[in-house]
Amino acid sequence: MFQGETAITVDDKGRMAVPTAYRDLVARVSGNRLVLTYNPFEAGCLWLYAEKEWERVRDDVMSKPNTQRVVRTLQQKLVGSSAVLELDANGRLSIPASHRNAVGIEKKAVLLGMGDKFELWSEQAHRALIQQTLSDGDLGDELLDLRL
């Protein structure tokens, strides 16, 4: 569904323009609404889901018993901190200040299309991610035969 990397500028009001290549798709699959939440696995990154896909993720996460701290933390970061955003007439999303501040997004960010969701990275965190290299030891057996 979504793929590619786009440099994003965030204005003083916390608005970012969704790339024009994605606007029709977002309108079609999600009625111009995306759900924003924290990436619980990597610092410096937010996730943006189309509403239907978000509902699947939310329901799956909330179906887990919250008797373990890791499950409660996941539920808090994903569901408790989520926000429904709507594209304005100019194709922009207003990213809440709390989310921007938590992941270090200021003026520059990077939007990655990751299939069923977007990842919105602070420019600094994205640069650090790209500079990391993977070794064979980092890959599980199921990925060793992947042909890239």
From Swiss-Prot:
Compartments reported by the entry: Cytoplasm, Nucleoid
Principal subcellular localization: cytoplasm
Pfam entry (one): MraZ
SpoVT-AbrB domain boundaries: 5-53, 82-125
Segments crossing the lipid bilayer: none
Acyltransferase keyword on record: no
GO molecular function, one term: transcription cis-regulatory region binding
Keywords, in A-Z order: Cytoplasm, DNA-binding, Repeat, Transcription, Transcription regulation
Signal peptide: none
Domain of life: Bacteria
One Gene Ontology cellular component: nucleoid
UniProt GO BP: negative regulation of DNA-templated transcription initiation
Coiled coil: none
InterPro entries in the record: MraZ, MraZ_C, MraZ_dom, MraZ_N, MraZ_sf, SpoVT-AbrB_dom, SpoVT-AbrB_sf
Family the entry assigns: Belongs to the MraZ family.
Subunit-structure text: Forms oligomers.
Name assigned to this protein: Transcriptional regulator MraZ
Origin species: Xanthomonas campestris pv. campestris (strain ATCC 33913 / DSM 3586 / NCPPB 528 / LMG 568 / P 25)
Taxonomic lineage: Bacteria, Pseudomonadati, Pseudomonadota, Gammaproteobacteria, Lysobacterales
